[in-house]
Curated annotation (Swiss-Prot):
Quaternary structure and interacting proteins, as annotated: Component of the cytochrome c oxidase (complex IV, CIV), a multisubunit enzyme composed of 14 subunits. The complex is composed of a catalytic core of 3 subunits MT-CO1, MT-CO2 and MT-CO3, encoded in the mitochondrial DNA, and 11 supernumerary subunits COX4I, COX5A, COX5B, COX6A, COX6B, COX6C, COX7A, COX7B, COX7C, COX8 and NDUFA4, which are encoded in the nuclear genome.
Organism name: Salmo salar (Atlantic salmon)
One GO term of the biological process aspect: electron transport coupled proton transport
Reaction(s) this enzyme catalyzes, per UniProt: 4 Fe(II)-[cytochrome c] + O2 + 8 H(+)(in) = 4 Fe(III)-[cytochrome c] + 2 H2O + 4 H(+)(out)
EC number assigned by the record: 7.1.1.9
Record's protein name: Cytochrome c oxidase subunit 1
Principal location listed in the UniProt entry: mitochondrion
Amino acid sequence: MAITRWFFSTNHKDIGTLYLVFGAWAGMVGTALSLLIRAELSQPGALLGDDQIYNVIVTAHAFVMIFFMVMPIMIGGFGNWLIPLMIGAPDMAFPRMNNMSFWLLPPSFLLLLASSGVEAGAGTGWTVYPPLAGNLAHAGASVDLTIFSLHLAGISSILGAINFITTIINMKPPAISQYQTPLFVWAVLVTAVLLLLSLPVLAAGITMLLTDRNLNTTFFDPAGGGDPILYQHLFWFFGHPEVYILILPGFGMISHIVAYYSGKKEPFGYMGMVWAMMAIGLLGFIVWAHHMFTVGMDVDTRAYFTSATMIIAIPTGVKVFSWLATLHGGSIKWETPLLWALGFIFLFTVGGLTGIVLANSSLDIVLHDTYYVVAHFHYVLSMGAVFAIMGAFVHWFPLFTGYTLHSTWTKIHFGIMFIGVNLTFFPQHFLGLAGMPRRYSDYPDAYTLWNTISSIGSLISLVAVIMFLFILWEAFAAKREVASIEMTSTNVEWLHGCPPPYHTFEEPAFVQVQAS
Protein backbone atom coordinates (compact mmCIF):
# COMPACT_ATOMS: atom_id res chain seq x y z
CA MET A 1 0.00 0.00 0.00
CA ALA A 2 2.21 2.79 -1.31
CA ILE A 3 2.06 6.20 0.33
CA THR A 4 1.24 7.59 -3.12
CA ARG A 5 -2.12 5.82 -2.97
CA TRP A 6 -3.18 8.21 -0.23
CA PHE A 7 -1.32 11.37 -1.24
CA PHE A 8 -2.21 11.36 -4.93
CA SER A 9 -5.48 9.44 -4.87
CA THR A 10 -8.25 10.41 -7.27
CA ASN A 11 -10.57 7.66 -6.04
CA HIS A 12 -13.72 8.90 -4.33
CA LYS A 13 -13.63 6.03 -1.81
CA ASP A 14 -10.03 6.73 -0.76
CA ILE A 15 -10.65 10.47 -0.53
CA GLY A 16 -13.83 9.82 1.45
CA THR A 17 -11.81 7.69 3.87
CA LEU A 18 -9.18 10.45 4.19
CA TYR A 19 -11.92 12.94 5.04
CA LEU A 20 -13.40 10.58 7.65
CA VAL A 21 -10.04 9.98 9.33
CA PHE A 22 -9.15 13.70 9.26
CA GLY A 23 -12.58 14.61 10.64
CA ALA A 24 -12.29 12.04 13.44
CA TRP A 25 -8.88 13.40 14.41
CA ALA A 26 -10.09 17.01 14.31
CA GLY A 27 -13.12 15.93 16.34
CA MET A 28 -10.80 14.71 19.09
CA VAL A 29 -8.91 18.03 19.04
CA GLY A 30 -12.22 19.90 19.24
CA THR A 31 -13.41 17.67 22.08
CA ALA A 32 -10.18 18.32 24.00
CA LEU A 33 -10.71 22.07 23.59
CA SER A 34 -14.32 21.79 24.79
CA LEU A 35 -13.15 19.88 27.88
CA LEU A 36 -10.73 22.71 28.65
CA ILE A 37 -13.68 25.13 28.47
CA ARG A 38 -15.81 22.97 30.77
CA ALA A 39 -12.88 22.48 33.19
CA GLU A 40 -12.48 26.26 33.46
CA LEU A 41 -16.22 26.68 34.06
CA SER A 42 -16.63 23.72 36.43
CA GLN A 43 -16.33 26.04 39.44
CA PRO A 44 -15.96 29.78 40.09
CA GLY A 45 -12.47 31.25 39.96
CA ALA A 46 -9.72 31.02 37.37
CA LEU A 47 -8.11 27.83 36.10
CA LEU A 48 -6.32 28.77 32.87
CA GLY A 49 -5.37 32.37 33.51
CA ASP A 50 -6.93 35.39 31.81
CA ASP A 51 -9.89 35.56 29.44
CA GLN A 52 -7.68 35.95 26.37
CA ILE A 53 -6.44 32.36 26.53
CA TYR A 54 -9.98 31.22 27.43
CA ASN A 55 -11.41 32.95 24.36
CA VAL A 56 -8.63 31.56 22.16
CA ILE A 57 -9.74 28.08 23.26
CA VAL A 58 -13.43 28.89 22.64
CA THR A 59 -12.63 30.29 19.18
CA ALA A 60 -10.45 27.32 18.22
CA HIS A 61 -13.10 24.90 19.52
CA ALA A 62 -15.71 26.45 17.23
CA PHE A 63 -13.52 26.56 14.12
CA VAL A 64 -12.19 23.02 14.62
CA MET A 65 -15.61 21.49 15.18
CA ILE A 66 -17.28 23.33 12.27
CA PHE A 67 -14.65 23.44 9.53
CA PHE A 68 -12.52 20.42 10.38
CA MET A 69 -14.95 17.96 11.97
CA VAL A 70 -18.60 18.30 10.88
CA MET A 71 -18.09 19.53 7.31
CA PRO A 72 -15.23 17.14 6.36
CA ILE A 73 -17.08 14.13 7.80
CA MET A 74 -20.58 14.87 6.49
CA ILE A 75 -19.82 16.38 3.10
CA GLY A 76 -16.28 15.17 2.41
CA GLY A 77 -16.48 11.74 4.02
CA PHE A 78 -20.04 10.48 3.54
CA GLY A 79 -20.61 12.66 0.47
CA ASN A 80 -17.58 11.32 -1.39
CA TRP A 81 -18.16 7.72 -0.38
CA LEU A 82 -21.89 7.51 -0.97
CA ILE A 83 -22.92 9.88 -3.74
CA PRO A 84 -21.13 8.17 -6.66
CA LEU A 85 -22.44 4.80 -5.38
CA MET A 86 -25.97 6.14 -4.94
CA ILE A 87 -26.25 7.65 -8.41
CA GLY A 88 -24.30 4.93 -10.24
CA ALA A 89 -21.34 7.12 -11.19
CA PRO A 90 -17.81 5.68 -11.59
CA ASP A 91 -16.34 8.53 -9.50
CA MET A 92 -16.77 12.23 -8.86
CA ALA A 93 -16.90 14.58 -11.87
CA PHE A 94 -13.50 16.12 -11.10
CA PRO A 95 -11.43 13.49 -9.28
CA ARG A 96 -8.16 15.46 -9.10
CA MET A 97 -9.94 18.56 -7.82
CA ASN A 98 -11.49 16.24 -5.23
CA ASN A 99 -7.98 15.35 -4.06
CA MET A 100 -7.05 19.03 -3.83
CA SER A 101 -10.21 19.81 -1.84
CA PHE A 102 -9.05 17.38 0.81
CA TRP A 103 -5.38 18.35 0.88
CA LEU A 104 -6.23 22.04 1.40
CA LEU A 105 -7.65 21.10 4.81
CA PRO A 106 -4.52 19.93 6.70
CA PRO A 107 -2.59 23.16 5.85
CA SER A 108 -5.70 25.13 6.82
CA PHE A 109 -5.83 23.30 10.16
CA LEU A 110 -2.12 23.94 10.62
CA LEU A 111 -2.62 27.69 10.13
CA LEU A 112 -5.45 27.68 12.69
CA LEU A 113 -3.26 25.90 15.24
CA ALA A 114 -0.41 28.30 14.42
CA SER A 115 -2.69 31.26 15.17
CA SER A 116 -2.96 30.01 18.77
CA GLY A 117 0.80 29.60 19.02
CA VAL A 118 1.89 33.10 18.01
CA GLU A 119 1.43 36.34 20.00
CA ALA A 120 -1.62 36.05 22.25
CA GLY A 121 -3.77 33.93 19.94
CA ALA A 122 -7.05 34.87 18.26
CA GLY A 123 -9.48 35.39 21.14
CA THR A 124 -12.23 36.89 19.01
CA GLY A 125 -14.88 34.18 19.03
CA TRP A 126 -15.55 32.36 15.75
CA THR A 127 -17.38 35.45 14.45
CA VAL A 128 -14.10 37.47 14.38
CA TYR A 129 -15.92 40.80 14.82
CA PRO A 130 -13.97 44.02 14.42
CA PRO A 131 -12.95 46.21 16.27
CA LEU A 132 -11.90 43.38 18.63
CA ALA A 133 -10.35 41.60 15.64
CA GLY A 134 -8.66 44.81 14.45
CA ASN A 135 -4.93 45.44 14.71
CA LEU A 136 -5.20 47.39 17.97
CA ALA A 137 -7.17 44.94 20.10
CA HIS A 138 -5.47 41.97 18.42
CA ALA A 139 -2.00 43.12 17.44
CA GLY A 140 0.27 40.53 15.87
CA ALA A 141 -0.24 37.70 13.40
CA SER A 142 -2.86 35.58 15.22
CA VAL A 143 -6.00 36.91 13.53
CA ASP A 144 -4.22 37.11 10.16
CA LEU A 145 -3.32 33.41 10.40
CA THR A 146 -6.92 32.61 11.33
CA ILE A 147 -8.12 34.54 8.26
CA PHE A 148 -5.73 32.62 5.99
CA SER A 149 -6.91 29.36 7.58
CA LEU A 150 -10.51 30.30 6.75
CA HIS A 151 -9.49 31.21 3.20
CA LEU A 152 -8.03 27.74 2.63
CA ALA A 153 -10.97 25.94 4.22
CA GLY A 154 -13.32 28.10 2.14
CA ILE A 155 -11.53 27.34 -1.14
CA SER A 156 -11.64 23.65 -0.23
CA SER A 157 -15.40 23.80 0.37
CA ILE A 158 -16.10 25.84 -2.79
CA LEU A 159 -14.18 23.37 -4.97
CA GLY A 160 -15.93 20.48 -3.24
CA ALA A 161 -19.30 22.16 -3.81
CA ILE A 162 -18.60 22.64 -7.54
CA ASN A 163 -17.58 18.99 -7.72
CA PHE A 164 -20.73 17.70 -5.99
CA ILE A 165 -23.09 19.90 -8.02
CA THR A 166 -21.50 18.79 -11.30
CA THR A 167 -21.44 15.14 -10.25
CA ILE A 168 -25.06 15.04 -9.11
CA ILE A 169 -26.45 16.91 -12.13
CA ASN A 170 -24.23 15.36 -14.80
CA MET A 171 -23.28 11.85 -13.80
CA LYS A 172 -26.57 10.02 -13.24
CA PRO A 173 -27.66 7.37 -15.76
CA PRO A 174 -29.88 9.17 -18.32
CA ALA A 175 -32.94 7.11 -17.35
CA ILE A 176 -32.88 8.32 -13.74
CA SER A 177 -34.58 11.65 -13.16
CA GLN A 178 -33.48 14.03 -10.42
CA TYR A 179 -36.63 12.95 -8.57
CA GLN A 180 -35.49 9.34 -8.31
CA THR A 181 -32.21 10.13 -6.56
CA PRO A 182 -31.85 9.21 -2.86
CA LEU A 183 -32.53 11.96 -0.31
CA PHE A 184 -28.90 12.08 0.83
CA VAL A 185 -27.93 13.06 -2.72
CA TRP A 186 -30.51 15.86 -2.65
CA ALA A 187 -29.27 16.98 0.76
CA VAL A 188 -25.68 17.28 -0.43
CA LEU A 189 -26.81 19.07 -3.62
CA VAL A 190 -28.67 21.72 -1.61
CA THR A 191 -25.73 21.96 0.79
CA ALA A 192 -23.28 22.45 -2.09
CA VAL A 193 -25.39 25.26 -3.55
CA LEU A 194 -25.46 26.95 -0.14
CA LEU A 195 -21.68 26.65 0.14
CA LEU A 196 -21.15 28.04 -3.34
CA LEU A 197 -23.32 31.09 -2.67
CA SER A 198 -22.31 31.89 0.92
CA LEU A 199 -18.56 31.28 1.14
CA PRO A 200 -17.53 34.04 -1.34
CA VAL A 201 -19.30 36.55 0.93
CA LEU A 202 -17.29 35.32 3.93
CA ALA A 203 -14.14 35.53 1.83
CA ALA A 204 -14.97 39.16 0.98
CA GLY A 205 -15.62 40.03 4.62
CA ILE A 206 -12.46 38.47 6.05
CA THR A 207 -10.34 39.83 3.18
CA MET A 208 -11.58 43.35 3.99
CA LEU A 209 -10.74 42.65 7.64
CA LEU A 210 -7.27 41.55 6.53
CA THR A 211 -6.70 44.80 4.61
CA ASP A 212 -8.12 46.84 7.51
CA ARG A 213 -5.55 45.19 9.76
CA ASN A 214 -2.53 45.38 7.47
CA LEU A 215 -3.05 47.92 4.66
CA ASN A 216 -4.76 50.76 6.56
CA THR A 217 -8.09 50.45 4.76
CA THR A 218 -11.13 51.45 6.85
CA PHE A 219 -13.94 49.17 5.67
CA PHE A 220 -14.92 48.48 9.29
CA ASP A 221 -13.42 51.57 10.96
CA PRO A 222 -15.73 54.57 11.57
CA ALA A 223 -12.66 56.85 11.70
CA GLY A 224 -12.32 56.43 7.93
CA GLY A 225 -16.01 56.25 7.09
CA GLY A 226 -16.33 52.49 7.57
CA ASP A 227 -18.79 50.56 9.73
CA PRO A 228 -18.22 47.47 11.91
CA ILE A 229 -21.87 46.54 11.30
CA LEU A 230 -21.00 45.97 7.64
CA TYR A 231 -18.72 43.15 8.76
CA GLN A 232 -21.52 41.62 10.81
CA HIS A 233 -23.83 41.64 7.78
CA LEU A 234 -21.18 40.03 5.57
CA PHE A 235 -20.24 37.46 8.19
CA TRP A 236 -23.79 36.39 9.01
CA PHE A 237 -24.85 36.28 5.37
CA PHE A 238 -22.36 33.42 5.29
CA GLY A 239 -22.80 32.33 8.91
CA HIS A 240 -26.48 31.54 8.81
CA PRO A 241 -26.42 29.43 5.63
CA GLU A 242 -23.37 27.77 7.21
CA VAL A 243 -25.43 26.36 10.08
CA TYR A 244 -27.83 24.85 7.53
CA ILE A 245 -24.81 23.50 5.62
CA LEU A 246 -23.87 21.71 8.87
CA ILE A 247 -27.30 20.10 9.38
CA LEU A 248 -28.70 19.44 5.86
CA PRO A 249 -26.45 16.44 5.03
CA GLY A 250 -27.51 15.10 8.44
CA PHE A 251 -31.16 15.39 7.35
CA GLY A 252 -30.33 13.27 4.31
CA MET A 253 -28.52 10.62 6.35
CA ILE A 254 -31.33 10.46 8.93
CA SER A 255 -33.87 9.96 6.12
CA HIS A 256 -31.92 6.93 4.88
CA ILE A 257 -31.46 5.46 8.35
CA VAL A 258 -35.11 5.91 9.37
CA ALA A 259 -36.43 4.39 6.13
CA TYR A 260 -34.01 1.44 6.30
CA TYR A 261 -34.59 0.47 9.94
CA SER A 262 -38.36 0.95 9.62
CA GLY A 263 -38.34 -1.68 6.90
CA LYS A 264 -39.88 0.82 4.46
CA LYS A 265 -38.96 0.91 0.79
CA GLU A 266 -38.91 4.70 0.77
CA PRO A 267 -39.21 7.59 3.23
CA PHE A 268 -42.67 9.07 3.75
CA GLY A 269 -43.35 12.06 1.50
CA TYR A 270 -40.24 11.92 -0.67
CA MET A 271 -41.12 15.01 -2.71
CA GLY A 272 -42.14 16.91 0.42
CA MET A 273 -38.72 16.07 1.88
CA VAL A 274 -36.98 17.39 -1.26
CA TRP A 275 -39.01 20.60 -1.36
CA ALA A 276 -38.53 21.09 2.38
CA MET A 277 -34.75 20.91 1.97
CA MET A 278 -34.85 23.37 -0.92
CA ALA A 279 -37.11 25.69 1.09
CA ILE A 280 -34.75 25.52 4.09
CA GLY A 281 -31.83 26.28 1.77
CA LEU A 282 -33.58 29.30 0.26
CA LEU A 283 -34.93 30.68 3.54
CA GLY A 284 -31.52 30.19 5.18
CA PHE A 285 -30.23 33.09 3.07
CA ILE A 286 -32.84 35.67 4.08
CA VAL A 287 -32.77 35.48 7.88
CA TRP A 288 -29.14 36.38 8.68
CA ALA A 289 -29.86 39.53 10.71
CA HIS A 290 -31.57 37.53 13.48
CA HIS A 291 -28.00 37.18 14.78
CA MET A 292 -27.86 40.98 15.02
CA PHE A 293 -31.07 41.92 16.87
CA THR A 294 -28.97 43.84 19.41
CA VAL A 295 -27.27 46.24 16.96
CA GLY A 296 -30.20 48.65 16.80
CA MET A 297 -32.18 47.83 13.66
CA ASP A 298 -35.53 49.44 12.82
CA VAL A 299 -38.56 47.81 14.40
CA ASP A 300 -39.92 46.85 10.96
CA THR A 301 -36.59 45.22 10.05
CA ARG A 302 -36.71 43.25 13.30
CA ALA A 303 -40.31 42.24 12.59
CA TYR A 304 -39.31 40.90 9.16
CA PHE A 305 -36.33 38.90 10.42
CA THR A 306 -38.40 37.49 13.30
CA SER A 307 -41.19 36.23 11.04
CA ALA A 308 -38.86 35.01 8.27
CA THR A 309 -36.89 33.02 10.85
CA MET A 310 -40.05 31.43 12.21
CA ILE A 311 -41.14 30.39 8.71
CA ILE A 312 -38.11 28.05 8.52
CA ALA A 313 -39.81 25.98 11.23
CA ILE A 314 -42.47 24.92 8.70
CA PRO A 315 -40.28 22.96 6.22
CA THR A 316 -38.29 21.69 9.21
CA GLY A 317 -41.55 20.45 10.73
CA VAL A 318 -42.43 18.77 7.44
CA LYS A 319 -39.19 16.81 7.71
CA VAL A 320 -39.64 15.86 11.37
CA PHE A 321 -43.20 14.62 10.87
CA SER A 322 -42.23 12.79 7.68
CA TRP A 323 -39.56 10.89 9.63
CA LEU A 324 -42.16 10.00 12.26
CA ALA A 325 -44.60 8.96 9.50
CA THR A 326 -41.86 6.78 7.97
CA LEU A 327 -41.47 5.01 11.32
CA HIS A 328 -45.26 4.58 11.64
CA GLY A 329 -46.43 1.06 10.89
CA GLY A 330 -42.97 -0.16 10.00
CA SER A 331 -41.39 -3.39 11.17
CA ILE A 332 -38.82 -1.60 13.29
CA LYS A 333 -35.31 -3.04 13.53
CA TRP A 334 -33.99 -1.74 16.86
CA GLU A 335 -30.38 -1.42 15.82
CA THR A 336 -27.96 1.29 16.92
CA PRO A 337 -28.28 3.59 13.87
CA LEU A 338 -32.02 3.87 14.52
CA LEU A 339 -31.33 4.82 18.15
CA TRP A 340 -29.09 7.65 16.92
CA ALA A 341 -31.79 8.69 14.44
CA LEU A 342 -34.53 8.72 17.10
CA GLY A 343 -32.22 10.67 19.41
CA PHE A 344 -31.58 13.07 16.54
CA ILE A 345 -35.29 13.65 15.85
CA PHE A 346 -36.11 14.26 19.52
CA LEU A 347 -33.14 16.47 20.42
CA PHE A 348 -33.05 18.36 17.13
CA THR A 349 -36.71 19.22 17.74
CA VAL A 350 -35.85 20.51 21.23
CA GLY A 351 -33.07 22.62 19.71
CA GLY A 352 -35.51 23.88 17.08
CA LEU A 353 -38.00 24.95 19.74
CA THR A 354 -35.39 27.05 21.58
CA GLY A 355 -34.56 28.48 18.15
CA ILE A 356 -38.17 29.61 17.78
CA VAL A 357 -37.85 31.30 21.19
CA LEU A 358 -34.70 33.13 20.07
CA ALA A 359 -36.32 34.18 16.77
CA ASN A 360 -38.46 36.68 18.71
CA SER A 361 -36.42 39.87 18.46
CA SER A 362 -37.70 41.26 21.78
CA LEU A 363 -36.82 38.08 23.68
CA ASP A 364 -33.51 37.79 21.86
CA ILE A 365 -32.45 41.24 23.11
CA VAL A 366 -32.49 39.69 26.60
CA LEU A 367 -31.10 36.26 25.68
CA HIS A 368 -28.47 37.36 23.13
CA ASP A 369 -24.93 36.35 24.14
CA THR A 370 -26.17 34.28 27.10
CA TYR A 371 -25.84 30.54 27.60
CA TYR A 372 -29.39 30.13 26.29
CA VAL A 373 -27.98 30.68 22.79
CA VAL A 374 -25.09 28.27 23.52
CA ALA A 375 -27.59 25.64 24.66
CA HIS A 376 -29.74 26.21 21.57
CA PHE A 377 -27.04 25.73 18.96
CA HIS A 378 -25.36 22.88 20.82
CA TYR A 379 -28.66 21.01 20.85
CA VAL A 380 -28.87 21.26 17.05
CA LEU A 381 -25.12 20.66 16.52
CA SER A 382 -23.89 18.47 19.36
CA MET A 383 -27.11 16.42 19.30
CA GLY A 384 -28.23 17.06 15.74
CA ALA A 385 -25.19 17.03 13.47
CA VAL A 386 -23.12 14.74 15.73
CA PHE A 387 -25.97 12.24 16.28
CA ALA A 388 -26.52 12.14 12.50
CA ILE A 389 -22.79 11.53 11.97
CA MET A 390 -22.73 8.74 14.57
CA GLY A 391 -25.89 7.12 13.20
CA ALA A 392 -24.56 7.29 9.66
CA PHE A 393 -21.19 5.93 10.76
CA VAL A 394 -22.56 2.84 12.50
CA HIS A 395 -24.98 2.32 9.60
CA TRP A 396 -22.42 2.58 6.77
CA PHE A 397 -19.31 1.30 8.56
CA PRO A 398 -19.89 -2.24 7.18
CA LEU A 399 -20.10 -0.77 3.66
CA PHE A 400 -16.85 1.17 4.06
CA THR A 401 -14.84 -1.62 5.70
CA GLY A 402 -16.60 -4.95 5.23
CA TYR A 403 -16.59 -5.45 9.02
CA THR A 404 -19.42 -5.13 11.54
CA LEU A 405 -19.33 -3.14 14.76
CA HIS A 406 -20.22 -4.84 18.06
CA SER A 407 -23.94 -4.11 18.35
CA THR A 408 -24.19 -4.25 22.16
CA TRP A 409 -21.25 -1.91 22.66
CA THR A 410 -22.49 0.59 20.08
CA LYS A 411 -25.83 0.65 21.94
CA ILE A 412 -24.07 1.26 25.27
CA HIS A 413 -21.98 3.95 23.58
CA PHE A 414 -25.18 5.61 22.38
CA GLY A 415 -26.58 5.53 25.92
CA ILE A 416 -23.47 7.11 27.46
CA MET A 417 -23.30 9.79 24.77
CA PHE A 418 -27.02 10.55 25.12
CA ILE A 419 -26.70 11.08 28.87
CA GLY A 420 -23.47 13.06 28.48
CA VAL A 421 -24.61 15.63 25.93
CA ASN A 422 -27.96 16.21 27.62
CA LEU A 423 -26.37 16.62 31.04
CA THR A 424 -23.89 19.05 29.47
CA PHE A 425 -26.28 21.28 27.56
CA PHE A 426 -29.71 21.11 29.19
CA PRO A 427 -28.60 23.05 32.31
CA GLN A 428 -27.21 25.78 30.06
CA HIS A 429 -30.78 26.82 29.23
CA PHE A 430 -31.25 27.63 32.92
CA LEU A 431 -27.95 29.53 33.06
CA GLY A 432 -29.00 31.59 30.04
CA LEU A 433 -32.44 32.38 31.43
CA ALA A 434 -30.68 33.46 34.65
CA GLY A 435 -28.53 35.81 32.61
CA MET A 436 -25.11 34.14 32.52
CA PRO A 437 -23.19 35.66 29.57
CA ARG A 438 -21.17 33.71 26.98
CA ARG A 439 -17.42 33.92 26.40
CA TYR A 440 -16.43 34.67 30.01
CA SER A 441 -14.08 32.41 31.95
CA ASP A 442 -15.59 33.18 35.36
CA TYR A 443 -19.03 33.82 36.84
CA PRO A 444 -20.81 34.82 40.09
CA ASP A 445 -21.31 32.02 42.64
CA ALA A 446 -25.04 31.88 41.93
CA TYR A 447 -24.34 30.04 38.68
CA THR A 448 -22.13 27.36 40.25
CA LEU A 449 -24.55 24.42 40.47
CA TRP A 450 -25.64 24.23 36.85
CA ASN A 451 -22.10 24.87 35.59
CA THR A 452 -20.77 22.01 37.72
CA ILE A 453 -23.48 19.66 36.41
CA SER A 454 -22.73 20.80 32.84
CA SER A 455 -19.02 20.06 33.30
CA ILE A 456 -19.78 16.58 34.71
CA GLY A 457 -21.85 15.96 31.57
CA SER A 458 -18.86 16.89 29.42
CA LEU A 459 -16.77 14.24 31.19
CA ILE A 460 -19.45 11.63 30.47
CA SER A 461 -19.29 12.62 26.79
CA LEU A 462 -15.51 12.19 26.95
CA VAL A 463 -16.02 8.62 28.20
CA ALA A 464 -18.28 8.05 25.17
CA VAL A 465 -15.62 9.38 22.77
CA ILE A 466 -12.97 7.09 24.27
CA MET A 467 -15.38 4.14 24.16
CA PHE A 468 -16.04 4.87 20.48
CA LEU A 469 -12.32 4.56 19.75
CA PHE A 470 -12.33 1.21 21.55
CA ILE A 471 -15.38 0.04 19.54
CA LEU A 472 -13.53 0.95 16.33
CA TRP A 473 -10.44 -0.95 17.44
CA GLU A 474 -12.55 -3.96 18.41
CA ALA A 475 -14.26 -4.10 15.00
CA PHE A 476 -10.95 -4.08 13.11
CA ALA A 477 -9.43 -6.59 15.54
CA ALA A 478 -12.33 -9.07 15.50
CA LYS A 479 -12.90 -8.81 11.71
CA ARG A 480 -16.50 -10.03 11.68
CA GLU A 481 -17.23 -9.94 7.96
CA VAL A 482 -20.61 -8.88 6.60
CA ALA A 483 -22.64 -11.98 5.73
CA SER A 484 -25.40 -10.60 3.52
CA ILE A 485 -27.19 -7.36 2.75
CA GLU A 486 -30.93 -6.91 2.33
CA MET A 487 -31.33 -5.08 -0.96
CA THR A 488 -34.25 -2.69 -1.34
CA SER A 489 -34.87 0.11 -3.81
CA THR A 490 -33.44 2.63 -1.35
CA ASN A 491 -30.04 1.20 -0.49
CA VAL A 492 -28.40 0.93 -3.92
CA GLU A 493 -25.05 1.94 -2.40
CA TRP A 494 -24.76 -1.64 -1.04
CA LEU A 495 -25.18 -3.19 -4.51
CA HIS A 496 -21.50 -4.08 -4.95
CA GLY A 497 -21.08 -5.81 -1.58
CA CYS A 498 -19.08 -4.87 1.51
CA PRO A 499 -16.69 -3.30 0.95
CA PRO A 500 -17.34 -2.42 -2.71
CA PRO A 501 -14.55 -2.93 -5.26
CA TYR A 502 -12.02 -0.12 -5.70
CA HIS A 503 -13.69 0.81 -9.02
CA THR A 504 -17.46 0.61 -9.33
CA PHE A 505 -19.83 1.42 -12.22
CA GLU A 506 -16.97 1.40 -14.73
CA GLU A 507 -19.62 1.08 -17.41
CA PRO A 508 -22.92 2.97 -17.03
CA ALA A 509 -25.52 1.14 -14.96
CA PHE A 510 -28.53 -0.33 -16.76
CA VAL A 511 -31.62 1.34 -15.34
CA GLN A 512 -35.08 -0.10 -15.88
CA VAL A 513 -37.71 2.58 -15.34
CA GLN A 514 -41.01 1.29 -13.99
CA ALA A 515 -44.02 2.45 -15.98
CA SER A 516 -46.14 4.27 -13.43
